[in-house]
């Protein structure tokens, strides 16, 4: 019995190694194709998860990916996902199927499309039409975000940021990781998270800590990351901090969560 279990375990490890080898080869091929098509790959590490963003080389990466620079890292074959930015003449030409949902009470509005059992997504400033479309692979390991050509830079950053948050949330959850909507204060090497719906005063509560508690620092003001590592619950800064420019590549143990309501 033990010999049979050992053989099955060895076979499983071999299958996993073969799968990883195929995926590494696929990702290298994808990167080469993007490079040959005039795309530049950029790698970022958020809460220990590395992902790749491929954007046209003609774009100023320091501008489009400004908030990600503190999280920049070297190339990796062990990627959480890869996102590519593509420009199209007309978003209406991107085949995504019928609209199933348009969610959220305020921007960004979140669109869901369904076609032949496959889902794609979109984001927008208004409910009238999507401003970008995110076409994803079945396992969310690869995605392309489509933006109309000639759009102002803010539309490009809007599309990339929201697509990355979608991909990160979907892929990282399998690794004891949550991207949450909250404001986080760091104090005495510990993190305190303030949760609540938009408008309930998360940022205001953090500001009160900053103004009244010595040594308090803002870690992130909109979308921090919580992850369990070796049994310890940690809270990380992220490139996504809403209207507040607070993009800290830092981590502290999570000591408290407060849910605000009014």
Q: What role is predicted for each listed range?
A:
Residues 1-193, 197-198, 208-217, 225-262:
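A noncatalytic interaction/capping subdomain that flanks phosphate/NTP-handling catalytic cores
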Residues 202:
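Conserved lysine of the Walker
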């Amino acid at each position: 019995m033990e010999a049979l279990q050992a053989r099955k375990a060895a076979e499983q490890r071999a299958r996993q190694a073969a799968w990883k080898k195929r995926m590494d080869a696929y990702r290298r091929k994808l990167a080469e194709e993007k490079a040959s098509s005039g795309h530049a790959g950029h790698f970022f590490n958020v809460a220990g998860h590395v992902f790749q963003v491929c954007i046209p080389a003609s774009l100023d990466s320091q501008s489009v990916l400004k908030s990600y620079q503190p999280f920049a890292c070297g190339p990796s074959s062990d990627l959480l996902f890869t996102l590519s930015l593509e420009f199209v003449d007309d978003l209406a030409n991107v085949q995504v199927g019928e609209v199933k949902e348009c969610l959220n009470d305020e921007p960004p509005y979140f669109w869901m499309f369904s076609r032949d059992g496959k889902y794609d997504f979109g984001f927008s400033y208004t409910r009238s039409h999507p401003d970008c479309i995110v076409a994803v692979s079945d396992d969310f390991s690869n995605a392309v975000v489509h933006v109309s050509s000639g759009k102002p830079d803010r539309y490009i950053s809007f599309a990339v940021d929201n697509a990355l948050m979608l991909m990160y949330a979907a892929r990282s959850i399998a690794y004891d990781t949550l991207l949450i909507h909250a404001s986080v204060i760091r104090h005495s090497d510990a993190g305190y998270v303030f949760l609540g719906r938009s408008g309930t005063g998360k940022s205001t509560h953090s500001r009160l800590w900053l103004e009244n508690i010595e040594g308090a620092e803002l870690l992130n003001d909109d979308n921090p990351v919580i992850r369990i590592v070796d049994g310890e619950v940690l809270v990380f800064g992220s490139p996504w901090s809403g209207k507040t420019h607070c993009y800290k590549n830092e981590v502290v143990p999570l000591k408290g969560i407060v849910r605000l309501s009014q």
